[in-house]
């Protein structure tokens, strides 16, 4: 919103606006530069840092303890920005250009060749009318469950050769390295996201990807429970139940011959099983055991993959809503008696 001079009331509006505009212009220049390194910084890193800083400034408008706090500035950016994007969505749809999804700062649009001129005209009109600028990337394919969980492949021109290359972008459950990008997400069986990727992009059967992995960490997940709980393993040894208290942060995988792991409330004794009550094996300390000896429950991971795939291919929700209609349309429901 630098174009409209949005700034915290207690700051010099012109100086603040010029700073934001400089960061925006620099980011666009860096992003489209042919240089791999700019001022000693890799091009992609430079562009990403500027994007994060610009977005962070908006976030600081709403932070009461911060030096940029201004509730009115927050509303000016939010409300006006959304209205401008809605105006663009409306114009595109009125011209039979499908808007696939929209969020706070951008749109995903499906443009056929015969609509390319209309699309360019509408974008130019919108930029002129609002004073905003629009940057676009071309998608090769999009596989999405919702706006927060998707796999996208972008067509990127190689800066040196000029050839088009495909660049992957993952978000949410589709990202095998989600835990590395956001430590709060925890570590959760990266093999699932990898198998889904191979299934959609390279047509590799889910079970093939699962069984080809030799790294037990691909199948592991972690659970960090609050201090009001402790973690217990329960297993059968020589026909008797044995219970052992584990550390609160536990790493485990699902197996065919393991044991149950539960978090137990320290006061009430209330219990809840990890991994939906499946048999698991705790592996807080990594060893060199062969993957075959782990006796991994591949069916569990297979089903987890299809929890992602089915909502996309069958048009149902992640919780399975819509299966009834699918069965009816497929003729899988038969009346007990004829009419």
Short names for language-model regions:
Residues 1-339:
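Conserved acidic
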